Amino acid sequence: MNFRFVLRIISYILLIEAALMVPSVGIALYQQEWNALYGFCVTYAILFLCVGLLFIITKNYQRGHFFAREGLVTTGLTWIVMSAIGCLPFVFSNEIPHFVDAMFEMVSGFTTTGSSILLNVEEMSYSLLFWRSFSHWVGGMGILVFLLAIVSVGGKNGGFTMHIMRAESPGPASGKIVPKMKDTAKITYSIYAALTVIDALLLIIVGKMPVFDAVCIAFGTAGT
């Protein structure tokens, strides 16, 4: 088991999660939701501390070979770590003060389970509601598939993309649209994003729905 390689991938995943939270931070600033903004700031501090520690631990890592067991471990750790970090804005903003409840909410999002501990999601701040909805969209295709589409981290045997796609993609099997798995990930995510945009536009134009509500609902619809 190439643990250092797996941990280095997790550090890249955390950096992607940091980027994914940026729109929510922008919404918090625009809406002047200071408690939510505080929650995101503390989360960023913890996230970058974790990334720094992971980079130190994996300083002399070697890519080596990447097999199915590494793919399964990477996928499992990604769900756990992303959910644990992703739930912190809810905790530190005090909108979902209990860590277990917030963790449940994010696991539900990133795994597209759809369950919730919230009785009325509309009572949440705009920024955290957006982050909650966005987690459903990210989990719909899988964050590791997104990583494949934008970053080159393949192992020596070229097995990284194949085993990650098999472990992360929905359905009993994953095939190639084009010869390279990386290109397949790009095409798949492009189609996924396009369908989400079309969904949101239909809700806005036909359903006469406010833009924010339409986008959040489109995230959840596309993810499931």
Pin down the residues of each PLM region.
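Membrane-proximal intracellular helices of multi-pass ion channels
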Residues: M1-T224
